[in-house]
Amino acid sequence: MSLLESISKNIYSLDNSSIEKTKQRLDRLIHPTGSLGKIEDICMQLAGIFGNENFDTSKKVIIAFAGDHGVYEEGVAPDPQNITKLQFPNFSKGLCGVGVISKFVGADVVAVDVGINCDEKLDGVLDYKIRKGTSNMAKGPAMSKQEAIRCLEIGIEIAEQCIEKDYKVIGIGEMGIANTTPSTAIISVISGCDPLEVTGIGAGLKKERLKHKAEVIRKAIEINNPNPTDGVDILSKVGGFEIGSMAGVILGCSANRIPVVIDGFISYAAALIAYKINPKTREYMIASHLSAESGTKRALDILKLDPLLNMDMRLGEGSGAALAFDIIEASNYTYKNMATFDEIDMGR
């Protein structure tokens, strides 16, 4: 049995007993029942994930993956492809968006190269390179089935390494010029909607180029004909190495009963791949923010996820997931430290 098969078979639903115990305490807190809103939802979900109403969320990490994309040659992104190579080392150095925010919220960042188009090893970056970028999905499959499984299993492996280091909350992030194109293709395939409905500007594509980007995605879907019910098939035909690796983190976290915080648009696509491999993974996901990218609503509707934040962000990197860490920690602190009606005489 492969690692992917083994992990997928070990994903179970949340612990309802712990959820109920947490709800009972929440209902006794000195506040109108339910008035803490999503704070209460977070606490109940975390209890169900950990199988314990006395859960710990103090040690947090963003796992970020980077890869380049053959479809870049179709003119779907405005920036030079070598930006991936130049920017990604800044993740672990704490110099970019996710690095700075993670530092502020007390989270670590693990940066992993799974497919950057370069030969050199990058400073502060783990080297798990599958190859130097995917193939052009507008001309054929982005990767082989074996490569798709490999990037999923890399994600599982990195997640389990972090869990062994006692990280209790894991967020996902990414870097890859042109990676909104495969992400949009994944969302289009799974939602069944036309690519133009879910195609956005990514990292700053001019609006007059949107139609071209959608046409490239449509062509890729027509040529490759991915099976909308098969996560591995979709990933191999129109995905990306960093997208598959993020999906692997979701699978690894779910099998090990660890909450996984989803970032923005690219990670929605990864979440959909994980969901197609095992629908129970959705129960372990916390959506950090509502991405400003087109296609967001389609993806979140399928996953039935309600983001914690709406910040008009479309940076990616894991920046939104890092921001959400503080909300998760504050929710846990509130749950554990607020007084109950049993403890204080409120005249009830």
From Swiss-Prot:
SUPFAM superfamilies: Nicotinate mononucleotide:5,6-dimethylbenzimidazole phosphoribosyltransferase (CobT). Keywords: Cobalamin biosynthesis, Glycosyltransferase, Transferase. CDD domains: DMB-PRT_CobT. GO terms for molecular function: nicotinate-nucleotide-dimethylbenzimidazole phosphoribosyltransferase activity. Gene3D superfamilies: 1.10.1610.10, 3.40.50.10210. It catalyses: 5,6-dimethylbenzimidazole + nicotinate beta-D-ribonucleotide = alpha-ribazole 5'-phosphate + nicotinate + H(+). One of its GO terms (biological process) is cobalamin biosynthetic process. The keyword Transport does not apply. The active site is at E317. Its EC number is 2.4.2.21. Pathway: Nucleoside biosynthesis; alpha-ribazole biosynthesis; alpha-ribazole from 5,6-dimethylbenzimidazole: step 1/2. It comes from the Bacteria. The keyword Kinase does not apply. Belongs to the CobT family. Catalyzes the synthesis of alpha-ribazole-5'-phosphate from nicotinate mononucleotide (NAMN) and 5,6-dimethylbenzimidazole (DMB). This is Nicotinate-nucleotide--dimethylbenzimidazole phosphoribosyltransferase. It comes from Clostridioides difficile (strain 630).
